[in-house]
Every structure is written in C-alpha cells, then in structure tokens.
Amino acid sequence: MSRDVLTPYPGLATSVGYYFSAMEEVREQLRNAVKDMDVQPLGRTAFRGAHSIGALVLHIGEAEWWWMQCNVAGHRLTEQDQQAACWDVLDEPDAFLAKGYTAEFCLAELDKIRNQTRGILVGLTENDLERIITFERHGEMRDHSLRWILHHLIDHEAQHKGQILMLKRIMALN
C-alpha cells in the first residue's frame, strides 16, 4: 500500500517546516517534469504569446527570491540582483531560447534560491507565521502574513508546474 504523508522539514519550527516540506514536494514534481528536457524544447515557445518552459522554471525562482529576500528578509533590490538569470525572465518570451540555458542550469538556479529561502526560515518560530509584512507594490501598500506568503509560493509553483505539464503535452514532449 502506498502512503503519502507530509512531515515538517528538520531544523525548522514545526509549522514553518510543514510549509517548507510542501514547497519541497512541489519542487520535486517540477524537477521531475523538466530535468530530462533538451535545450531546444526547454527554450522554445509552444505558440505565439506563450512562455517557454525554461522561462517559467526561472520565473518560479524569481518569484520565490523576490518574496523571501525583498519582502520577508527586507533586502533592497540592486542592479546586480536584476542581472540574475531569473530576473524579468518572462518579459521577452522569444529571447529565452537564445540564452541556451539547460534544464540542469535552470534547476540549479532554483536550488540556490531555495537554499537562501531555507536560510531565512531557519531562525523563525511558530509565531513568525502570523507576522505581517508590509511593502509597496505597483504604488500600493500591501500587507501579507508570512503564512500567506509561504502558501502563495506553494500555490504559485504548483500552478506553473501545471502550466509546464500542459505545454509539454501541447509540444508532444511526454
């Protein structure tokens, strides 16, 4: 009999560890979906207006980095940050293929970001999940709890994973 259970990630406060374990579960599903893809199918778009699978993978990392580093940890975005491979990766859908990024490269970028996220979460307590983080976005002040941010990151990655799986079917890559 198969049994799936979610356990808290070791070294993190219990509830924080459950969120991180859920993030890791979705990441493993994403990794399995793209790890064996060649550069061409990873980088090309399935149809006009679509994003490439590789760009979506890096966008997942960009979102996690922005939420965790800039909002949770309070990092101020620099010009150097904006040179990262994942930054604004969805802005020019047709430009991604020319970069020649491999699946291994894209997943390694995600691993770096995930390690940074884990580093932020290590020192947090159960009570920190209710901490309200206030920031400006698109000229509007926003409040989000850390619990909501972690949930959002799981949901965001899961949605894009589904999009990636759909694109693979459209491109006959299954």
Task: Map each language-model feature to its residues.
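Conserved catalytic core of Hanks-type protein kinase domains
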Residues: 36, 59-60, 123
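Short, contiguous alpha-helical
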Residues: 2-9, 20-24, 28-31, 40-91, ...
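Short Lys/Arg-rich basic patches
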Residues: 15-19
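Acidic/histidine-rich alpha-helical segments that form the ligand environment
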Residues: 89-131, 148-156
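Hydrophobic alpha-helical core bundles mediating ligand binding, dimerization, or RNAP-core interactions
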Residues: 23, 27-30, 34, 110, ...
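Contiguous N-terminal and early-domain "leader" segments and peripheral loops that mark the onset or edge
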Residues: 1-2, 115
